[in-house]
Amino acid sequence: MKRAFILVLDSFGIGATADAKEFGDVGSDTLGHIADQCEQGLANNDQRQGALRLPNLSKLGLAMAHKESTGRFAPGLDADAEIIGAYGHAAELSSGKDTPSGHWEIAGVPVLFEWGYFTDKANSFPKELTDRILARAGIDGFLGNCHASGTQVLDDLGEEHMKTGQPIFYTSADSVFQIACHEETFGLDRLLELCQIAREELADYNIGRVIARPFIGPGKGQFERTGNRRDLSVEPPSATVLQKLAEEKQGQVVSIGKIADIYANCGITKKVKATGIPALFEATLEQIKQAGDNTIVFTNFVDFDSAYGHRRDVAGYAAALEYFDGRIHEVMELMQEDDILILTADHGCDPTWPGTDHTREHIPVLVYGQKVPAGSLGRRETFADIGQTLASYFGTSPMDYGKNFL
């Protein structure tokens, strides 16, 4: 019986890529810089103290993969751990350092075209675009129209939004159009309808995602985003390994978290909603228990990126990594003889880096299974090696990009 479990630690980069200079990210290193801060006692909070401890991920080869990527061991990680899995680091072939590009490339389809972007920091959106969106939605105006941090924009504009009923439109360095609205005063269904209108009106702009950012709270300093985020993505430009498994092998692809949104539901046969790392873990364990032959269980742990990476919260990121490390054995204990587990990421988001954007980094490729030989996979030239490996494992037609590493 063939089953694969893919766990994406969203934004967990392990060192800058050779092309990082093109993105302003030379020297970025999500794992390494978190470990440095922990070692120096600068990442303590009520959940964790001291050096970064990831014993289980180190056994799976994380410390070695980081060493091969950067030339140094991350402090605190066990450099002498007995390795029980295959490990490597992968560079990105795609033109961007965004979530869809990273995930699509993982599934064998790199993004070789350029996304559209809203590059102006203020007055970011063309008036003709916003006029059409507002007219279709029956709304008399909007707030924002700028590049913004998702949490800061709520403090800046949340109260005005509640008073006026006008949605908050904002963007970032990624190919995104984000809409923040209060779940209670504006309404979640109304927000999702507005996002669908925006998705349709953005067809000619080549924007990767429209993101619904619902929030709650009575006022400034008390607003918080809810778990009802939705990502409305465009479809991948060609069939991913997920689609090939579903169509060629009548297999099952179980999306946990925001995976289905990222792939615009293409190739997804079952969707499981969960919010927060503990709930995502529980959902993953439950779906593994239920999984039959020719099944991929695919989970995105978005909080590493959204709650800690973008917010530049080193201590929070470290605590989340240690929590994840403490539970990964639960997945491994459910694995059968032919199963494979792949731990990876979609880009970096170094919480010590200037700004709030993603960073262009290698991603870890950690592979475990009873039949997977332990040892180095070296540097992989594309994330698509993961997709090609899955295509070979499940016996689908090959992908156009990537090399099988098993």
Swiss-Prot record:
SUPFAM superfamilies: Alkaline phosphatase-like (SSF53649), DeoB insert domain-like (SSF143856). Keywords: Cytoplasm, Isomerase, Manganese, Metal-binding. Pathway: Carbohydrate degradation; 2-deoxy-D-ribose 1-phosphate degradation; D-glyceraldehyde 3-phosphate and acetaldehyde from 2-deoxy-alpha-D-ribose 1-phosphate: step 1/2. It is found in: Cytoplasm. It is an enzyme of class 5 (isomerase). Its main location: cytoplasm. It catalyses: 2-deoxy-alpha-D-ribose 1-phosphate = 2-deoxy-D-ribose 5-phosphate; alpha-D-ribose 1-phosphate = D-ribose 5-phosphate. PANTHER family: PHOSPHOPENTOMUTASE. This is Phosphopentomutase. The lineage of its organism: Bacteria, Pseudomonadati, Pseudomonadota, Gammaproteobacteria, Vibrionales.
